[in-house]
């Protein structure tokens, strides 16, 4: 029997609280339930492949929140982060990818699917698995892409703003694309 590589496996064992997926342990909010019920007549319709209305709405919402335009061309939607990670590596075809350890297995899965070489940046238990110099040192000029979760999955560590800015600037200088996964933010 193959072990599940993704969280949310409520079928093979009983789980009280599952922190491996970004589900709501309190259940569906009442407003979401009402919206779902209002849309029930459309359940048999195939969704808009371009996600046009969703893209327009989110672009507008983010633009208002940030006080500057967030173009709809900057947005990409999928059926979960794992699908998007696969799409990213297949579109970019990175030769070398850095993945902090521990991290979400979906990064490694995507990197292997694209035949990328993986360079693991092992985070230290002594620093509560917070990235630091060891991650910066792993991000050398031969690296094409960094997968980074903030907060980290599975540790839950949230990066400090100053460190994140330093890391992003370092990657910009090295020409490294950063895939910043904020699914749990």
Regions found by a protein language model. Give the residues of each.
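Electropositive phosphate-/nucleotide-binding environments in soluble metabolic enzymes
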Residues: 26, 30, 52, 177
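Short linear sequence motifs
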Residues: 4, 39, 97-100, 177
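Conserved core of the PLP fold type I
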Residues: 44-172, 179, 184-185
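Residue-level marker for buried hydrophobic side chains located in beta-strands
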Residues: 19, 178-179
């Amino acid at each position: 029997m193959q072990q599940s590589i993704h969280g949310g496996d409520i079928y093979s064992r009983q789980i009280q609280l599952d922190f491996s997926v970004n589900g709501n342990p309190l259940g569906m909010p009442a407003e979401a339930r009402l919206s779902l019920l209002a849309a029930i007549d459309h359940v048999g319709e195939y969704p808009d492949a371009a996600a046009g209305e969703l893209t327009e709405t989110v672009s507008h919402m983010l633009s208002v929140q940030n006080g500057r335009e967030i173009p709809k061309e900057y947005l990409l939607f999928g059926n979960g982060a794992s699908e998007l990670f696969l799409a990213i590596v297949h579109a970019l075809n990175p030769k070398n990818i850095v993945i902090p350890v521990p991290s979400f297995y979906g990064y490694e899965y995507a990197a292997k699917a694209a035949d990328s070489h993986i360079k693991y940046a092992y985070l230290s238990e002594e620093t509560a698995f917070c990235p630091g110099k060891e991650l910066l040192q792993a991000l050398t000029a031969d690296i094409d892409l960094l997968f980074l979760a903030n907060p980290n999955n599975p540790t839950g560590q949230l990066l400090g703003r100053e460190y994140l800015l330093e890391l992003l600037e370092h990657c910009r200088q090295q020409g490294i694309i950063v895939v910043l996964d904020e699914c749990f933010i």
